[in-house]
Amino acid sequence: MTAAAAGTVMLGDLAIARLGYGAMRLTGPGVMGPPPDLMAVRETLHALAGLGVTFVDTANSYGPLISELLVRGALHPYHGFVVATKGGLVRPAPYQWATDGRPEALRSAVEGSLKTLGVDRLDLWQLHRIDPNVPADEQFAVIADMQRSGMIRHVGLSNVSVPQIEDARKHFTVASVQNLYHVIDRRSEPVLEHCEQLGIPFIAYYPLATGALAAADSILAPAAAKLGITPGQAALAWLLKRSPWIVAIPGTQNPAHLRENVAAASVQLSDEQFAELERIGKRANLLRTPRP
């Protein structure tokens, strides 16, 4: 069982498996500092290639820098991988996130990620969040300039609305959109539908609701048991069937959990099974998860 079973989607000119890996959880508590078990993290990252995972998503604010450094240490020179990173957020303290979309700050973020990841050009650089205190056109303009100069291969957006996507498209081709989305929290449904219409990959972060959907007491547990799979696999399988444009990026520091997540790529839900999981999600109380 490998991630290839989920199929692929084109991110610009790059084909990626639709079950990827989110590297936010490679850090310590509060997405700050080093992980508690560095050996487990390295084992997890080293297992990605053998499991067919080809897309890895990180950010300079994870750690900060810790996640990018660990990805580089385990995967460089990235043969067979598309490595995406993000910039535009800064970290005042654990669990805290602040935007900094000043053009000079965004340029510094890209230059820093190039150095930290050890590459001459970033496969995919995503604006982590549009800074409401800086004109969006100024943020988009410097990103477009960096792409033209060869620092960035493809540009993506994160935590955005449909109008923001359209504003960005005036400056550059939007290669991907990354928003919070899972079977319970579907506030980004209009964004997903817009991406489908445009043929833009939609990267679903927190696909397991920071672990709540994968827990033994998950609201999906009874339905998953009937299917002979784990609750987390049910959540991921629902996402992968929801749209061929969705890329799910569950994260973990545990090699066993990684294998469990990847096995979800081979789960083939019937239309009835998909509808049942959807009904459960709609009945559930909305899980209010943070949006870094």
PLM regions with names:
Residues 13, 50, 72-82, 114-118, ...:
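Acidic (Asp/Glu)-rich catalytic clusters
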Residues 1-82, 210, 286, 291-292:
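N-terminal binding-site loop/beta-alpha segment at the start of enzyme catalytic domains
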Residues 3, 130-292:
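Beta/alpha (TIM)-barrel catalytic core signal, keyed to glycine-rich beta->alpha loops juxtaposed to Asp/Glu
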Residues 21, 58, 85, 124-127, ...:
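Conserved beta-strand positions
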Residues 114-132:
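Active-site groove signature of glycoside hydrolases
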Residues 53, 119-122, 152, 174:
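A structural motif
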Residues 27-31, 90-97, 214, 257-260:
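A short acidic, helix-capping loop that chelates divalent metal ions and anchors anionic groups
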Residues 34-48, 101-117, 161-166, 187:
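Short, acidic/polar
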